[in-house]
Amino acid sequence: MTDRLKCLIWYCIDNQNYDNSIFYSERLHAIEDSNESLYLLAYSHFLNLDYNIVYDLLDRVISHVPCTYLFARTSLILGRYKQGISAVEACRSNWRSIQPNINDSISSRGHPDASCMLDVLGTMYKKAGFLKKATDCFVEAVSINPYNFSAFQNLTAIGVPLDANNVFVIPPYLTAMKGFEKSQTNATASVPEPSFLKKSKESSSSSNKFSVSESIANSYSNSSISAFTKWFDRVDASELPGSEKERHQSLKLQSQSQTSKNLLAFNDAQKADSNNRDTSLKSHFVEPRTQALRPGARLTYKLREARSSKRGESTPQSFREEDNNLMELLKLFGKGVYLLAQYKLREALNCFQSLPIEQQNTPFVLAKLGITYFELVDYEKSEEVFQKLRDLSPSRVKDMEVFSTALWHLQKSVPLSYLAHETLETNPYSPESWCILANCFSLQREHSQALKCINRAIQLDPTFEYAYTLQGHEHSANEEYEKSKTSFRKAIRVNVRHYNAWYGLGMVYLKTGRNDQADFHFQRAAEINPNNSVLITCIGMIYERCKDYKKALDFYDRACKLDEKSSLARFKKAKVLILLHDHDKALVELEQLKAIAPDEANVHFLLGKIFKQMRKKNLALKHFTIAWNLDGKATHIIKESIENLDIPEENLLTETGEIYRNLET
């Protein structure tokens, strides 16, 4: 498998697909912990402008010349001259006798093939909002080359139904090749039928092989957004993500940043090259990707010779065996990524955990696990996994905005502040860093400062949907509901499957009393992520407001089954049971809730109410007293209930004021 992985890594590097080269380099380094595999991983990160990650990877490598040279180049960019000099001087005896290799063969270097061109074309279509065309491009890219993992991830992000078992199969034209170094001329003439698309009843009879992808893309790009046309039309075009105004601001920022010694130049000609870098819609400042950029061009000839000699020793049969093994591994990765994109979280978790242990301990898998636990609302476990990722790759900023949100939910201000400090120090031009800082200010209820940080993040990347969603929540916290709705709509324009923005719009309408609009947006979010207990609870809240208690109870019960530890869903369920005069079942729910949230005054207050109604005065007094001790602000309500302990109440939920605030929001 290692030979095939090395071929794939160089193939990805030749085609400037650095996300894929990082992905395969991680797989190789997990299997073969050697200087060569470490160099390939570091070199891929270097080409991806992840200089701090390169520095961390190569900091302790002593005698390997290519690694030392790459470390020196990285130290030069980061301004850490002393460390670079020490590393180069330490292995002087190893590189002093190396002769220039000007006549090194370039026959193994290739040009972008159809799959690479389709991948970058699809990425541009996706960023421009043409999801149907983007889907067609990605489908064809994966059909031509199943090793194109970034195209596969783009398909999962769009929401196309896929079957990973049928995606990651060796195409016929590849089985006749000894390796990737042979020409692939006319390879597209034998493009396999994209059988990996899951057929729906509506599209199974269609003769167009891309009919499924068209229907999926259209469902998100047209029907789902049509109801919001009038709202989007009201938004000033200059404020929309990716508008001329913001692109001008972004270019201005890039121009200003040239004075930084650690920041490289950026120009318009490189935009197309940067579009194929990441499906998470981030932007970075990049430098020209020319052959002169390659820092190891002279010192990696030994690696290339070793690679060529290994190819000479490898037989077509051995390559086929490696391809088969690698495809089995990719099927597991593909299933996990697809299931996570579909929010089938338990299945995704099982899939990632079924990977070989060395693969589980790589940044890619740890990030996916952290996101999976986060979506499962298991913030403690998510924090644990993300912290492991931070220990493994301390300079990584990708996906750290999810980590910061988990810390925000856990109310852990110190770790969140530390994370914000570290990410800003190592990645000051990353939008994720500024969103993390915004979460830090938000936790301190400094919403104005948080909004300033978010605006900076949007300047750096006008297509970062998380920033718009966070901006919407901060405006909502300031009761600026119109601005909040505008921000959430911008997030949806960037990514129509970003369910958090649909949820945010629903909450704004819920707060402003527009129950029908709130229900529509919650339902839309739940269509994207049907396994989120919070969304199901919010739909139940709409029915509760409309006094349809039985329907509300159905949704609360479903939410409790999705997340047994959801205090909000269980509390709402108990309240509805009380409204239906089913006090015994309500008591059971509250007892379970007490075990989940023993320090929640609301729970004890409601328990006291029920015991009072059941004429169990001692238990009622006990829980009223506990509630009093836990929430001193609600003493007037609790005191009144204690004073009227002998007077039965017709409606136990008449007093739903201050004491319910924590669980109601």
Swiss-Prot record:
<feature type="repeat" description="TPR 9">
    <location>
        <begin position="601"/>
        <end position="634"/>
    </location>
</feature>
<dbReference type="Pfam" id="PF00515">
    <property type="entry name" value="TPR_1"/>
</dbReference>
<keyword id="KW-0498">Mitosis</keyword>
<feature type="repeat" description="TPR 2">
    <location>
        <begin position="329"/>
        <end position="362"/>
    </location>
</feature>
<feature type="repeat" description="TPR 1">
    <location>
        <begin position="115"/>
        <end position="148"/>
    </location>
</feature>
<keyword id="KW-0131">Cell cycle</keyword>
<protein>
    <recommendedName>
        <fullName>Anaphase-promoting complex subunit 3</fullName>
    </recommendedName>
</protein>
<feature type="repeat" description="TPR 8">
    <location>
        <begin position="568"/>
        <end position="600"/>
    </location>
</feature>
<comment type="function">
    <text>Component of the anaphase-promoting complex/cyclosome (APC/C), a cell cycle-regulated E3 ubiquitin-protein ligase complex that controls progression through mitosis and the G1 phase of the cell cycle. The APC/C is thought to confer substrate specificity and, in the presence of ubiquitin-conjugating E2 enzymes, it catalyzes the formation of protein-ubiquitin conjugates that are subsequently degraded by the 26S proteasome.</text>
</comment>
<dbReference type="GO" id="GO:0032153">
    <property type="term" value="C:cell division site"/>
</dbReference>
<keyword id="KW-0132">Cell division</keyword>
<feature type="repeat" description="TPR 4">
    <location>
        <begin position="431"/>
        <end position="464"/>
    </location>
</feature>
<comment type="subunit">
    <text>The APC/C is composed of at least 13 subunits: apc1, apc2, nuc2, apc4, apc5, cut9, apc8, apc10, apc11, hcn1, apc13, apc14 and apc15. Interacts with apc10 and cut9.</text>
</comment>
<dbReference type="GO" id="GO:0005737">
    <property type="term" value="C:cytoplasm"/>
</dbReference>
<dbReference type="GO" id="GO:0000070">
    <property type="term" value="P:mitotic sister chromatid segregation"/>
</dbReference>
<dbReference type="InterPro" id="IPR011990">
    <property type="entry name" value="TPR-like_helical_dom_sf"/>
</dbReference>
<keyword id="KW-0833">Ubl conjugation pathway</keyword>
<feature type="repeat" description="TPR 7">
    <location>
        <begin position="534"/>
        <end position="566"/>
    </location>
</feature>
<dbReference type="GO" id="GO:0003677">
    <property type="term" value="F:DNA binding"/>
</dbReference>
<dbReference type="GO" id="GO:0016567">
    <property type="term" value="P:protein ubiquitination"/>
</dbReference>
<keyword id="KW-0677">Repeat</keyword>
<dbReference type="GO" id="GO:0051301">
    <property type="term" value="P:cell division"/>
</dbReference>
<feature type="repeat" description="TPR 5">
    <location>
        <begin position="466"/>
        <end position="498"/>
    </location>
</feature>
<dbReference type="GO" id="GO:0005680">
    <property type="term" value="C:anaphase-promoting complex"/>
</dbReference>
<dbReference type="InterPro" id="IPR019734">
    <property type="entry name" value="TPR_rpt"/>
</dbReference>
<dbReference type="GO" id="GO:0051306">
    <property type="term" value="P:mitotic sister chromatid separation"/>
</dbReference>
<dbReference type="GO" id="GO:0051728">
    <property type="term" value="P:cell cycle switching, mitotic to meiotic cell cycle"/>
</dbReference>
<dbReference type="Pfam" id="PF12895">
    <property type="entry name" value="ANAPC3"/>
</dbReference>
<feature type="DNA-binding region">
    <location>
        <begin position="191"/>
        <end position="257"/>
    </location>
</feature>
<keyword id="KW-0802">TPR repeat</keyword>
<dbReference type="GO" id="GO:0031145">
    <property type="term" value="P:anaphase-promoting complex-dependent catabolic process"/>
</dbReference>
<dbReference type="GO" id="GO:0007091">
    <property type="term" value="P:metaphase/anaphase transition of mitotic cell cycle"/>
</dbReference>
<dbReference type="Pfam" id="PF13181">
    <property type="entry name" value="TPR_8"/>
</dbReference>
<keyword id="KW-0539">Nucleus</keyword>
<dbReference type="GO" id="GO:0005634">
    <property type="term" value="C:nucleus"/>
</dbReference>
<dbReference type="Pfam" id="PF14559">
    <property type="entry name" value="TPR_19"/>
</dbReference>
<feature type="repeat" description="TPR 3">
    <location>
        <begin position="363"/>
        <end position="396"/>
    </location>
</feature>
<comment type="similarity">
    <text>Belongs to the APC3/CDC27 family.</text>
</comment>
<feature type="repeat" description="TPR 6">
    <location>
        <begin position="499"/>
        <end position="532"/>
    </location>
</feature>
